[in-house]
Each structure stands twice: as structure tokens, then as C-alpha cells.
UniProtKB/Swiss-Prot annotation:
Zn(2+) 1 binds at D36, H38, D85. CDD domains: MPP_CD73_N. Glycans are attached at N53, N311, N333, N403. The gene is NT5E. The record marks H118, D121 as: Transition state stabilizer. This is 5'-nucleotidase. Coiled coil: none annotated. Zn(2+) 2 binds at D36, D85, N117, H220, H243.
Length: 574
């Protein structure tokens, strides 16, 4: 008997079964996501400043609520996630200190949130109460570990991961936070921020042992780290990120943001999987919208979508809008108090102030120096002539088209952190190190790029990090007619700067370690508001304080940098 003939009926039965019982259809999940909202509860102008022309304004939680409700009604499996930095950025946070964040995130029905660095701006106590105690959804971070007496106090208020039931399936969400947070905010000494990848892997492994085969990494470390997590952490299927305010889009973008890549950005993991990575810019301007199909083993089959521009074509939810109006009453005193006027656009955007000289930086530095005009004598016109200011400390522009009016509310959006402008004495060699640090990772939109007053600096970005300052001149003080002279490495200079930098923030450890003398100064917002009131009408310009040499092949443009990167990627993969 031919053995093959005996197997033929069985094979036919199996083939028939395959036709009658086809493979299970992929399971589809819709991921809605926000990041870096920074207290933009109300709609804003297109550049995230105060709304001037309502027909052209964007975002706000009332408009976000409308779109989220529409999608939840239309689609069966939806998660609403936030990748951190809800705290800080407008008068809302200055007054309510996070209570507003918890209230409106609860109202929108968020499913999970990762901790961002700015959630620690009011210290751990300002995170615990109100946010951690008042939200009714999980707050996540796998790489933050508490120690000492704080460990028991904060236990159970945040988690490394959470398993969510979505329809008939379960989805694991694992959180992470920038390990640079101690340099960027005020988490104190009893929280340890571990390496993201090292901390995430064991938590993902735990989820796998619990038979969770669909895992989203939700976190706040920036696009470059997001991509590394997608590549290195085995078992992560999707990465939803924040911190770098990255705009990704497939097709023609709907507003002025230039995409840093397609949405989703696909990373090939070390074990050969295609992992979608997404962010949704910042300030509540967009709602990230990603549809992912999983097979029965939890593998990503397809992923597609795009951020949704929350413009005026989307109506504001009337119930949320009414709630906003109730909360707004407490802010009206700040909104109506006029400090002065501007007849030019005050450019405080990250696209400018983290890449090149911006006139908002010039205005703030001029105010800092003006606030320290004292002690003239026969030898010196003033005791200090220099200011440095981290570009990341400038958080919003001010639009001159609103009759040019500048209010406390406007200024609180520009300078929301509540620090002081301090006076330090530094050697010229320390200043040189600080300016090298300012551009050591130029092009990544990081906050350490310095705005200046009383200083002329020229960079050559084509040179290696640590050797990019080609010219550094400072305004003399011991002179009757101020002029610029070369920085002397061995001379001691007085410099006005934010208290954040004095304490080593944004990686300026050399200032913290090498300062010769330190005197605390006045509250930042009081310094600038006083200057505006004194000047009455403002028109700060871009004056050439910060320049890039021809060898840099760089003009400090955020858009051109991203276009250059995209061009390189296209060339490499042609």
C-alpha cells in the first residue's frame, strides 16, 4: 500500500477545514494621544500663545473633548493616553498648581498618563497633591524609583505599568520618564531616575509572563529615546512619546509645523519587528490618532493614522467649555492687568529660542540687566553687563496683534517656572565651557541653547562638540563708553542668570561647581514685568548677538534642520 495514498484524505480534510474556519481577523486598537500640553486648557493661537482671532485658534480641552467623544462613539476599541508634561506653561498652572490638570483630564476620561519632567516643577509634594491623589486613571513610570521616607509615602500613587481591558482583550501600558529630570526640574533627592531601556525591559517581561501580548510604551524622554526603546526593548509593540515636541505627519501637513518624519515613524527592532513610534507635537494643538491591528499572537500587522489638527472646524464641547468658564473667573485679575504694549511680535517659540537668537530672549536679558543697574563710579558705568538665559526657559510668544497689550497672563505663559534672576561671579574659562555646552547637541531642540545680553558669540557647528565657540566677546563695564572686548579666560566676570542655571539645570554643572560667588535675585516675572511697565512700548529686535559662521552650514532654523535630516534619510535609503 502506498503510504502517501493513505494520507491524502486526511490532507483534504485539513484543507477543507482551513477554508471553513479561516484565520482569526486582526484585532484593531485606536490610540488617541497627547503630550506636552503645558497648561493649554483654553484654545490658543496657532503658535500656542493667547488666542486672538477665535476663527484661527486651535486646541483647548473643550475642543479636544469633542473630537475624543466623536471617535469613541464611532470606534469600538479606543485608548486615550498622555505622554507627560501637562504641568506648567500658563497662568492656569500658576494659580491652580495642577488641580486643573487632574480635574479636566478626569473629565475627558484619560486611560493612562506617563510622568513628564515638568510634573516635578513644584517638587514631589506638588506632584502628589493634587495630581497623583486626584486623578482617576493610572499614572505611570517604570524608571522612577523612590527611596528613604518618600518610598512609603508615594507607594501606590504611581506604577511602572498597568493592564487595561479593552473590549475582550487586554493591553499593557508601561511608562517611562526622562532620566535627565533631576537636571530639568525639582524632583528632590529621594527619587532615582534610572536608564529608560534598562528599567523598561524587566517590566515588559513581567507583562509577558502575565500573558499580555499587546504592549504600549508610553513616556516622556524625547523622540531619540523613543526610537531606541522601540529598537532595544523586546516585547514593546508601540511607542507613544513626548518631551521633544516632535511633529510627525504623513502627507501634506495641515498647519505650519514641519514633519520630522512620517506618522507613524517605523523602527525595526533588534529582533526584526516593525514598531510604530508616535508623538503629537505639543500644546494641545493636535490629537494623535493611531490605528494598530494586532494578530492573535499580539504582533503588529498594520499601523496607520495622523495627528488631527484641532482647529476651529471642530466645535468646543459646551459642557467642558462652561466648566472652563467657571474656573476662569479666578484668573481674570491676571488677564486684565496691563503691563505695557509691544508693537512687534515677541518670538518666544521653541523653534526660534532653542536654535538661534530670538527677540524674546533679548527682551528678557535686557530686563535682567536693567534690573541690576546700580553702583556706577568713576571707573565703571555698571557693576554687571552680561546676561545668559537658557532658551528652554522661554515658554511662549506674545502676539502684537492683540492691540499689543501685554498682561500678567501673557507674561506668566512666557516665564511660568517662578525662579529668580541671580547674580554670580564666574571665570571666563567657565563662561567658555557654558557656551560650548549651549551647542554641544545643537539641532535637537534641547533647552540649554543660551540667549544672551551684553555678549556676542559666534559658533561653528561643523566642528566637534566642545570646540564650537569660535568667537566670544563681552561688554566692558570698566569703561565710559561700553564696547565689546574678547573674553579673557582668567578674568572674573559678573553675570546675571536664572536660578535654574545656578543650580546646574539643563546640564550647566560647570556653573554650579565653578561659581565664585552667588547672590540670589528678584523673582523672574517681577523683573520682566517691571521693565515692561518702565519702557511702556516695546520693539526688541534680533541684533546679531548670536551668530553662526559660514562653516557651520547652519542658520539655526528648526525647519531647515529637520529638512536636512530628512534629506539625508532619503539619500541613505534610495
Amino acid at each position: 500500500m502506498n503510504p502517501g495514498a493513505a494520507r491524502t484524505p486526511a490532507l483534504r480534510i485539513l484543507a477543507l477545514g482551513a477554508l471553513l474556519w479561516p484565520a482569526a481577523r486582526p484585532w484593531e486598537l485606536t490610540i488617541l494621544h497627547t503630550n506636552d500640553v503645558h497648561s493649554r486648557l483654553e484654545q490658543t493661537s496657532e503658535d500656542s500663545s493667547k488666542c486672538v482671532n477665535a476663527s484661527r485658534c486651535v486646541g483647548g480641552v473643550a475642543r479636544l473633548a469633542t473630537k475624543v467623544h466623536q471617535i469613541r462613539r464611532a470606534e469600538p476599541h479606543v485608548l486615550l493616553l498622555d505622554a507627560g508634561d501637562q504641568y506648567q506653561g500658563t497662568i492656569w498652572f500658576t494659580v491652580y498648581k495642577g488641580t486643573e490638570v487632574a480635574h479636566f483630564m478626569n473629565a475627558l476620561g484619560y486611560d493612562a498618563m506617563a510622568l513628564g519632567n515638568h510634573e516635578f516643577d513644584n517638587g514631589v509634594e506638588g506632584l502628589i497633591d493634587p495630581l497623583l491623589k486626584e486623578v482617576n486613571f493610572p499614572i505611570l513610570s517604570a524608571n522612577i524609583k523612590a527611596k528613604g521616607p518618600l518610598a512609603s509615602k508615594i507607594s501606590g500613587l504611581y506604577s511602572p505599568y498597568k493592564i487595561l481591558t479593552v473590549g475582550d482583550e487586554v493591553v499593557g501600558i508601561v511608562g517611562y520618564t526622562s532620566k535627565e529630570t533631576p537636571f530639568l526640574s525639582n524632583p528632590g533627592t529621594n527619587l532615582v531616575f534610572e536608564d529608560e531601556i534598562t528599567a523598561l525591559q524587566p517590566e515588559v517581561d513581567k507583562l509577558k509572563t502575565l500573558n499580555v501580548n499587546k504592549i504600549i510604551a508610553l513616556g516622556h524622554s524625547g523622540f531619540e529615546v523613543d526610537k531606541l526603546i522601540a529598537q532595544k526593548v523586546k516585547g514593546v509593540d508601540v511607542v507613544v512619546g513626548g518631551h521633544s515636541n516632535t511633529f510627525l505627519y504623513t502627507g501634506n501637513p495641515p498647519s505650519k509645523e514641519v514633519p520630522a518624519g512620517q506618522y507613524p515613524f517605523i523602527v525595526t527592532s533588534d529582533d526584526g519587528r516593525k514598531v510604530p513610534v508616535v508623538q503629537a507635537y505639543a500644546f494641545g494643538k493636535y490629537l494623535g490618532y493611531l490605528k494598530v491591528e494586532f494578530d492573535e499572537k499580539g504582533n503588529v500587522v498594520t499601523s496607520h493614522g495622523n495627528p488631527i489638527l484641532l482647529n476651529s472646524s471642530i466645535p468646543e464641547d459646551p459642557n467642558i467649555k462652561a466648566d472652563i468658564n467657571k474656573w476662569r473667573v479666578k484668573l481674570d485679575n491676571y488677564s486684565t492687568q496691563e503691563l505695557g504694549k509691544t508693537i512687534v511680535y515677541l518670538d518666544g517659540t521653541a523653534q526660534s529660542c532653542r536654535f538661534r537668537e530670538c527677540n524674546m530672549g533679548n527682551l528678557i536679558c535686557d530686563a535682567m540687566i536693567n534690573n541690576n543697574l546700580r553702583h556706577p563710579d568713576e571707573m565703571s558705568w555698571n557693576h554687571v553687563s552680561m546676561c545668559i538665559l537658557n532658551g528652554g526657559g522661554i515658554r511662549s510668544p506674545i502676539d502684537e496683534r492683540n492691540n499689543g497689550t501685554i498682561t500678567w497672563e501673557n507674561l506668566a505663559a512666557v516665564l511660568p517656572f517662578g525662579g529668580t534672576f541671580d547674580l554670580v561671579q564666574l571665570k571666563g574659562s567657565t563662561l567658555k565651557k557654558a557656551f560650548e555646552h549651549s551647542v554641544h547637541r545643537y539641532g535637537q531642540a534641547t533647552g540649554e541653547f543660551l540667549q544672551v545680553g551684553g555678549i556676542h558669540v559666534v559658533y561653528d557647528i561643523s566642528r566637534n562638540p566642545g570646540d564650537r565657540v569660535v568667537k566670544l566677546e563681552v561688554l566692558c563695564t570698566q569703561c565710559r563708553v561700553p564696547s565689546y572686548e574678547p573674553l579673557r579666560m582668567d578674568k572674573v566676570y559678573k553675570v546675571i542668570l536664572p536660578s535654574f542655571l545656578v543650580s546646574g539645570g539643563d546640564g550647566f554643572q560647570m556653573i554650579k561647581d565653578e561659581k565664585i560667588k552667588h547672590d540670589s535675585g528678584d523673582q523672574d516675572i517681577n523683573v520682566v514685568s517691571g521693565y515692561i511697565s518702565k519702557m511702556k512700548v516695546l520693539y526688541p529686535a534680533v541684533e546679531g548677538r548670536i551668530q553662526f559662521s559660514a562653516g557651520s552650514h547652519c542658520c539655526g532654523s528648526f525647519s531647515l534642520i529637520f529638512l536636512s535630516v530628512l534629506a539625508v534619510i532619503i539619500i541613505l535609503y534610495q
